[in-house]
């Protein structure tokens, strides 16, 4: 949690860090990823059989090696919009017997050469946990139950035996399952009303938890601020002893929200993720309101928020139907850093956050047949995943603010937009880690820092301009490591992310 005092442009900014004031434990799942059958995310991204850079499974070794440095705890699969017409059974068994199907989300052909077993094997090689989305478009409850049985079944039953026949004796124990994806959207096959979705989601959840009570089920929300979010929460967050429930455990464990931000202008781009902060706050209140109105007892586990699609994405410059391959700038990297600061500040309410997507599609990591490129947005992800874990701690920022245009415009009425964006963490190793984004395009900001002690390790991400990119054959944006003695004010460079690290 970071509190804020607004200063004039003439005042000296300050940051006060309080390591003894722990706010909440950070769920490492806020550094989760997402892989969809879209563009080159799967085919030519994580899976490229026949390429000299791939292993015996067809998995790109350079991609795996890079992703391992991010220590990604969970990866969502296989969609996304793709999920509304995907049938998992098409993607298991002998590859020469798998049918190719028309793909209606991105208007292509799905070969099904990469499916459930391949993805779960890839997760094991990467060292991450899978998160599956169920087909709420053309899919059925029987199909969903069969998929869970295939992945998790231990008995002498048809789909558990089919898994064994396909070469996997032990269950995969897939824990996270989403009840559809963006079913409210007009772009979806089988778009639903909030009334129809809520009824269907609750009934599916009952059946799924009867089959496997250990599942973590994620309700499909909108952006956290919509009537859809309130209605679905109100009708699905019921007491365990409700007459509508047949489960001894809560049916809904998380509520999903999605948001993408972007602007062609730097400052609206860099401040746009503050919309996500307000969305998290509103969603958290809606969860509490639904529980209060439905008489859910306080001892029943409270659902957390699953922000399972987020990123900087301009769908005009990176069209989804054309693969959504963004060329990210330093401005975008700073926006991603603000996104991550938001997640650290709001860790109390977050159970997961999945950047969309992991490879090639609006991604920090791009592939060619010959290798990989780490985009500008890679570096904030790397620093946060490595250092911003443990406990969110109290911090106070005093700073002047940016007073110009915001995107979306409503940010201006509900959030302050300081020149410095800050979050602070106390790691399990006893180190304080403070992430500071200076969004100012022209000015370094000299800041007093109360709480720093001893030698401070400094990691800085910046470039010559906010338009700097790593996609022109050279790395214009990277991490530079240095030290600071912790004495006097610290000057945060213009248009930069700085991570300060010292022993508490």
UniProtKB/Swiss-Prot annotation:
The keyword S-adenosyl-L-methionine does not apply. One of its GO terms (molecular function) is alpha-L-arabinofuranosidase activity. InterPro entries: Alpha-L-AF_C (IPR010720), Glyco_hydro_b (IPR013780), Glycoside_hydrolase_SF (IPR017853). It catalyses: Hydrolysis of terminal non-reducing alpha-L-arabinofuranoside residues in alpha-L-arabinosides. Transmembrane segments: none annotated. One of its GO terms (cellular component) is extracellular region. Its EC number is 3.2.1.55. Keywords: Carbohydrate metabolism, Glycoprotein, Glycosidase, Hydrolase, Polysaccharide degradation, Secreted, Signal. Glycans are attached at residues 152, 181, 269. It is found in: Secreted. Pathway: Glycan metabolism; L-arabinan degradation. GO terms for biological process: arabinan catabolic process; L-arabinose metabolic process. Its main location: secreted. Belongs to the glycosyl hydrolase 51 family. Alpha-L-arabinofuranosidase involved in the degradation of arabinoxylan, a major component of plant hemicellulose. Acts only on small linear 1,5-alpha-linked L-arabinofuranosyl oligosaccharides. This is Probable alpha-L-arabinofuranosidase C. The lineage of its organism: Eukaryota, Fungi, Dikarya, Ascomycota, Pezizomycotina.
